[in-house]
A protein has these predicted regions:
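Gram-negative outer-membrane assembly/targeting C-terminal domains
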Residues: 487-537
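Short loop/turn motifs that connect adjacent beta-strands in outer-membrane beta-barrel proteins
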Residues: 25-32, 146-147, 257-258, 362-367
Length: 537
């Protein structure tokens, strides 16, 4: 034991020593076996000029010392270092190598790093201290077999970091045996933010952390960065502007991700992802190895509600395959399209519908496969260029018709390789009906056919007039190409003008039809900026 101790100047030792010498007739006595067990020592030791034990330096120490039956006892050991003090009662048995101590300390824990094995050092290196921790503990073990070391006590920290993430305070019970570190009822403060748990276990041999019944109101990115850079990178796109309420439990790997099995119950907001801005969201997040599952997601969604789920399967290199389903009701068209397409056009109405993506990759939105449906109620949509391109023509037929509100709109659609296809988009208003058939991709490119039916929905007479004026409906069949923000319409067929002569007297707007039907319809209102596809962030 003494061979592990060094000092620049010998310590001062005062006291009484008693021992039994070997018989004078014994010319070759075994001093260790015969004499050392008889030594009795009572005294005081002082090391005023500092020293070291196995590379652990101290500025000074002192203690009463008792030694008998090969057992050292230091009942009032005081150790000084620049940052603080350690007070301990120590007992060490030379025969067995066992030791036991009661310790109160304000020393920097990094001082004991030379005493730890490589795995223990890695755990200690995760923490940096501005102020030394306050520790009261019992410690026991074997001087030559440090893996048998055990500890039980309490720790309080202030102004420290863990994996670079700062905290203003921590209080916890702590136990350590057999390379397993257990924190009992830990409480962490980060300014006004709080975290707590029933328990946190650290298996240093398996390099795993076990979290039991965690609760917090801390920024999620602080927690994920403390877990590890890889998981932080994968969730950084999901941003809570205020810390949510979180319940967390499960297994966290200290290195890698394959053994992760961590559950989050989150409830809070405002929340942002991609271009979406939501005032409130809640749900269950399950991180399982290289997979991430989002279940029971509920959100306030642009004046309405949305629910959904998602699965992500991460691949080497950072990309992920994923699938998701979203169901929305009573969403406001204007605020939703403003966020999705970055437009300021006047758009109104209520939307509800479903979107199910069965296969996709984060590498490209052109990998999307899926399906869904949309429904519109009481909508004003004419400042969406792909609809507004026909507004002038319809107003020429019947003043105001091209600006009337859509009483209802419906469509079902499929998605294949990032191309959306619908064969039944139907938009209705009083006196008019638009039907779209075609495709739209995530770059905003459109390829569709549009039919505009006049008077079909006019009360009482609409269906009759629409049948009588069947040629008028066919006149408004166009092929639409270009983009959502800059569509181009070309007539598919034109009806001979003579077919309108019987209706010129009762329907005065038909007189101006010639000037209102150019061969190429281009949409360029000064108050309608170009739509940007959701792909462009």
């Amino acid at each position: 034991m003494l061979e592990d101790v060094s000092w620049p100047q010998p310590p001062e030792l005062k006291g009484d020593v008693k021992l039994v010498l070997p018989a004078w007739t014994n010319r070759e006595p075994d001093w260790r076996a015969e004499v050392q067990p008889t030594i009795r020592l009572q005294g005081m030791v002082k090391l005023e000029h500092g020293g070291a034990y196995r590379g652990v330096d101290v500025s000074a120490l002192q203690s009463h010392v008792a030694y008998s039956n090969l057992v050292w006892r230091l009942p009032d050991l005081t150790v000084l270092r620049p940052e603080g003090t350690l007070e301990a009662a120590l007992e060490a048995d030379e025969r067995t190598g066992d030791f036991y101590a009661r310790v109160s300390s304000t020393l920097d824990l990094r001082m004991v790093r030379p005493l730890l094995d490589e795995e223990q050092q890695q755990g200690l290196d995760l923490v940096t201290f501005t102020n030394p921790p306050v520790i009261s503990a019992e410690v026991w073990g074997h001087a030559r077999e440090l893996e048998r070391t055990g500890l039980k006590g309490r720790v309080a920290l202030s102004n420290f970091t863990f994996r670079g993430e700062s905290a203003s305070g921590l209080q916890t019970g702590v136990q350590y045996t057999n390379k397993f570190l257990q924190f009992n009822s830990p409480r962490v403060q980060r300014g006004e933010q709080r975290m707590s748990a029933d328990g946190v276990g650290v298996d240093l041999a398996a390099q795993l952390v076990f979290l039991t019944n965690g609760f917090g109101t801390v920024e999620p990115m602080v927690v994920t960065r403390a877990i590890g850079a890889d998981i932080a990178q994968k969730v950084e796109a999901y941003q809570f502007k205020q810390p949510p309420v979180a319940h967390v439990y499960g297994t966290i790997p200290m290195h890698g991700e394959d053994t992760a099995d961590l559950h989050f119950e989150l409830d809070g907001g405002p929340f942002e992802w991609s271009r979406f801005h939501l005032p409130h969201i809640s749900g269950h997040v399950h991180w399982l190895g290289q997979q991430l599952f989002l279940n029971n997601i509920q959100a306030d969604f642009y004046g309405g509600q949305a629910a959904g789920s998602a699965q992500f399967h991460f691949r080497p290199g950072g990309e992920a395959d994923y699938q998701f389903a979203v169901f929305a009701t009573n969403a406001l068209l204007g605020p939703l399209t403003k966020d999705m397409f970055l437009v300021t056009n006047r758009l109104e109405g209520w939307l509800w519908g479903n979107l199910v993506v069965t296969n996709a990759s984060t590498a490209s939105m052109q990998t999307w496969d899926g399906y869904g449906d949309l429904h519109l109620r009481d909508g004003f949509i004419w400042e969406i260029p792909v609809f507004g391109i026909f507004s002038g023509v319809l107003n020429g037929m019947v003043p105001g018709l091209g600006n009337s509100r859509a009483s209802a709109g419906t469509c079902t659609f499929s998605i294949t390789n990032g191309v959306i296809r619908s064969e039944d988009m139907d938009i209705r208003s009083t006196g008019m009906r638009l039907q779209y058939r075609g495709t739209l991709d995530f770059d905003g490119k459109i390829n569709a056919r549009v039919e505009a039916g006049i008077l079909r929905d006019m009360p009482l007479f609409g269906q009759v007039f629409s049948t009588v004026l069947w040629p008028v409906t066919k006149l408004f069949e166009y092929k639409v190409t270009g983009t959502l923000g800059a569509p181009k319409a070309d007539p598919v067929s034109l009806v001979p003008k003579v077919m309108f002569l019987p209706f010129q007297l009762p329907f005065h707007p038909l007189r101006t039809l010639r000037g209102l039907l150019p061969e190429d319809l281009g949409f360029s209102p000064t108050n309608a900026p170009t739509l940007t596809s959701p792909k462009q962030n």
